[in-house]
């Protein structure tokens, strides 16, 4: 929606024409970008944060340079301390044990070069304060993202703001890791497709209306070939967070390294639901649904490839090594739906969907275990609830698979509790919460088998300016051409220029990340560099 205003010409020089956009050498200064929606265009400003202050123009977000201890249980200082403690525990679980025997000077030198060093800035954090909706009785929710500095053996350092959940890590788990007890480690992460602006609806919601009207939204088919700002920023942020965890685990060939598998949950089934609901309501044709399926399948392959390659690159350039795979736990359901839409022209029931999940394909045993631990009130009643429950299934899958294949008892060798790490946007905390509750039931059903589940939720440093609610690029997509201005209040073309999402990512996360994403978007057919913006 930018045709109503003539934007300035894009130039490389304008990316560095003011102090706010120059690289920062002071490690105590944090740089953020703030995106704003105007009537006919979007704009971005950069801000240096070096003292306690609200993030300019972002409602409910602040930066604390020096958190004072207020003594209250839910104060920012106490929450910050809990986050740092949780991250330290996760680091201890991942850190390779020392080799047994005497430690000479050569061993000390080798360990110093091969072991990453965690430095916690114990007083810096982002604070997210979410106000409840008007007339709601809900409480204000404060979330603390503590600053964590990670120096890796090779490659650039990692500077992140994270919120962590680790309630079920026990002292014995930390002792086991210190003593060298091996445990399987799996990292799960995910990403949505497109953005709600491009889709015209929110995938997790059902049939919706526009601004309270009674007319159901029928979205245009998502033909855009360009990666959205949300997709690019999520790939960058998740990749760097996972790189820190993977290198901490010593997967670069150091003694005592443990195998790490990274599982990417890129949705497909979840994006089939909305057009099928429109079809059932008699609002769209079979041809519309068929084309929608084709476009979603293509985007799934492209974004999965982009995220996989970005993570692999960030890990390898810091001396790590991981195995990355794309989840496919709902393959039996998606195959049935494709067959029904393209060949049979008849939609399966939810019972048909659950049947193929339980009895068809390589994931059937894990699905039987998963569905067996659900209460009757939790069992999916329609396709949308199956799709939403699949997010939880994928986080739990490594444990479900271990139980289903009886590898829990294996060859008799002692093994530590499996470690499952969910790395995701904080908006997906409900997936973690649901998975954690379901995993507790394993203790009763599986003779005490209780996998370790921890959550690491990195905060973005590219914020959207909204009246209320969480800052999110998925819901508030600024488009692919953005006006860079000198000040938040500026709505003038004077002294401004047009930048793209990758330019902003480069300013916040680094030129290397920008260049890598640029190459990978071209590789996977998601490049926005050579074509006009797709509205």
From Swiss-Prot:
Lineage of the species this protein comes from: Eukaryota, Fungi, Dikarya, Ascomycota, Pezizomycotina
Metabolic or biological pathway: Secondary metabolite biosynthesis
Biased composition (Basic and acidic residues): 105-114
Species assigned in the record: Aspergillus nomiae
Region annotation Disordered: where it falls in the sequence: 93-114
Physiological role: Arginine-containing cyclodipeptide synthase; part of the cluster that mediates the biosynthesis of a highly modified cyclo-arginine-tryptophan dipeptide (cRW). Within the pathway, AnoA acts as the scaffold-generating enzyme and is responsible for formation of the cyclo-Arg-Trp diketopiperazine (cRW) from L-arginyl-tRNA(Arg) + L-tryptophanyl-tRNA(Trp). Additional enzymes from the cluster then further modify the cyclo-Arg-Asp diketopiperazine (cRW) scaffold.
Name this protein carries in UniProt: Arginine-containing cyclodipeptide synthase anoA
Gene name tied to this protein: anoA
Record keywords: Ligase
Location of the motif Conserved DDXXE motif: 424-428
Catalytic activity: L-tryptophyl-tRNA(Trp) + L-arginyl-tRNA(Arg) = cyclo(L-arginyl-L-tryptophyl) + tRNA(Trp) + tRNA(Arg) + H(+)
EC number annotated for this UniProt entry: 6.3.2.-
GO molecular function: ligase activity
UniProt domain comment: The conserved DDXXE motif is essential for catalytic activity.
